[in-house]
Amino acid sequence: MKSIISLTAAAAIGVAMFVAPAFAADKGTVGIAMPTKASARWIDDGNNIVKQLQAAGYGTDLQYGDDDIPNQLSQVENMVTKGDKVLVIAAIDGTTLSDVLQKAHDAGIKVIAYDRLIRNSGNVDYYATFDNFKVGVLQANSIVDGLGLKDGKGPFNIELFGGSPDDNNAFFFYDGAMSVLKPYIDSGKLVVKSGQQGMDKVGTLRWDPATAQARMDNLLSAYYTDAHVDAVLSPYDGLSIGILSSLKGVGYGTGGQKLPIVTGQDSEIPSVKSIIAGEQHSTIFKDTRDLAKVTVDMVNALMEGKTPEVTDTKTYDNGVKVVPSYLLTPVAVDKTNYEKVLVEGGYYKADQLK
């Protein structure tokens, strides 16, 4: 997106974006470029990768770009200059890294795109991610099931939100969701009162919750003064919380105004709490522990001169090449299964969700 709940703005601003590298004597250092600390998800990713790489005997050089493209470019260039052996990059903007990746290639450094595909470069060696199309399918199925569309119920009003247009995953999420929702839209069982469809209309730059909240405010005032929105496709928990804030601000969730079905992604704690409270309807769980393991396995293979295991060699065309990829399976989470998936699975402790 990889897929954003956001931390408070004050906390995000207050966190230093430089993380001192930790070095191992034997195996060399792996550079890890993460996009932001303004999302709990990316903090978890960074911690999981560092923990597993260090356990495998590697030094780690973890940097967060603070959603600042030039900052991330500078960080990656420094990793190349310092001679990091492999780069693991979750790009802020997947289209901006071509020049620095050419330098990495010239220096013999392998590059793994981490959960966000790096585009327009032939120097992306592997991609570790989840089945992003399936993420969208699961989100849409949550809406279909929640509304009872398969039972012939409807019509219902729905509004659509997409992720950041500079994140390749956002298009997979949206396309996956629309593969399920479009037949219901075409038949009139789902009605997009705003008429806003397509990533050019519904995308949310940088996955920004405030932008999503402002757009939901505008949709409600322009199209729903005398109508009820029944569902909102949201691709990410951070957006979902902003959308729900907008809805609650005009009375949804009180009196006779039922909250619409609102989807999400990343199983961030505020959204899981919202699901438990009966507000957000669902989220998608992407186990970053497993993604870190796949990434470390790729690093090990590359450092040993072997070919990393992949599961997909056809889907992820970055505009220059089809990048060999390992796709993990996402899991839909709602009030009925969050304990089994998130608590019993060891991702969260029960008291974290209280």
From Swiss-Prot:
One of its GO terms (biological process) is chemotaxis. Disulfide bonds: none annotated. GO terms for molecular function: carbohydrate binding. Residues 1-25 form the signal peptide. CDD domains: PBP1_ChvE. InterPro entries: Bact_Solute-Bind_Prot2, ChvE-like, Peripla_BP_I, SBP_2_dom. Keywords: Chemotaxis, Crown gall tumor, Periplasm, Signal. It is found in: Periplasm. GO terms for cellular component: outer membrane-bounded periplasmic space. Its main location: periplasm. SUPFAM superfamilies: Periplasmic binding protein-like I. Required for effective transcriptional induction of the vir genes by monosaccharides in response to plant signals and for normal growth and chemotaxis towards certain sugars. Functions as a periplasmic multiple sugar-binding receptor protein. It does not interact with a transport system. Belongs to the bacterial solute-binding protein 2 family. This is Multiple sugar-binding periplasmic receptor ChvE. It comes from Rhizobium radiobacter (Agrobacterium tumefaciens).
